[in-house]
Amino acid sequence: MLGWFGIFGRSQEIQRLERALRAHGHHPALVMDAVKITTVKQLKAAAGGQTPDQNAIESAATLLAYCAMGREDFAENNGWSATAAVEDRIVAAFERGGTIDEKLVLLALTARMVHPSVRERFDLKAE
């Protein structure tokens, strides 16, 4: 995932995720490598073991950026319609259960990277 002992650099999937995070206004250095690696592994599992496509990477980055930045900062960088869309995704993820969105939000929560306003808004707790 991170290249062979770092000699060859980061994997293309990780690089794509980092670019997508940056495009949403969240610096990728603020996301732990373990979260990025696990995100890519979750996306691969959801794609039946195949390399995740760009849409899946973008979708995951949107969710992670929102969780980390909080509603206001995310909206400032991405607009209110994108903010409403990601909030709808979070609600739907926990209503359905077992979705990739739910897994990614729980990953962010476990990694302690969820903004306090997001934790409060969706009543998210890590136990």
Please tell me what each predicted stretch does.
Residues 1-5:
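Hydrophobic membrane-targeting and insertion signals
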Residues 6-53:
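Short terminal alpha-helical segments
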Residues 6-9, 75, 123:
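Compositionally biased, low-structure terminal segments
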Residues 12-13, 74, 88:
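Amphipathic alpha-helical interaction segments
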Residues 18, 34-44, 55-65, 82-86, ...:
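Amphipathic alpha-helical segments in structured regions that serve as interaction surfaces
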Residues 26-33, 46-55, 71-80, 94-104:
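Charged, low-complexity interaction regions
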Residues 79-127:
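Amphipathic alpha-helical binding modules
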